[in-house]
Amino acid sequence: EGLCTVVVKDDKTAAVVEVNSETDFVAKNETFQQFVKAVAEQAVESDAADMDAFMEEKWNEDPSKTVKDALVEKVAVIGENLKIRRFEKVVATNGCVVSYVHGGGRIGVIVEAETAVVNDAVKEALTNLAMQIAALNPKYVSRDEISEEYISHEKEILLAQSPRNQRK
């Protein structure tokens, strides 16, 4: 169980985090939800390359502590094991980022787009795209991640269907 949330800063930078709990009861707890938001706010400001570096950063809400210290403190307050499972930060250099969180924090999506124009219409289109991504649960985030084996397999399926589809 747990939650994910996204924080977007100045339409250029976004971070998504997932924080796990043992039960859905805790995931609905306001203290836990505020902590997840604080972790996302930390992530959007972070330059950490990985989770270990992120956990050792000074906690923005109390620089005398690390992110790890803040997590341990929340575990003591909430009384249940918690884990910051993952985070991802996206920075748009030539465009913008938008986000969408579905199901009260079950799925989080960030879309980065290169565009010369950033206005409400562009943001609305990108938000609609983010909603579709959440609904479709894609296997890959970018073209670069798709293996040649997968592409070949999909091409075989399409080629096999092609003669049948020509008659329709």
Regions found by a protein language model. Name each.
Residues 1-168:
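N-terminal assembly/interaction segments in proteins that build large macromolecular machines
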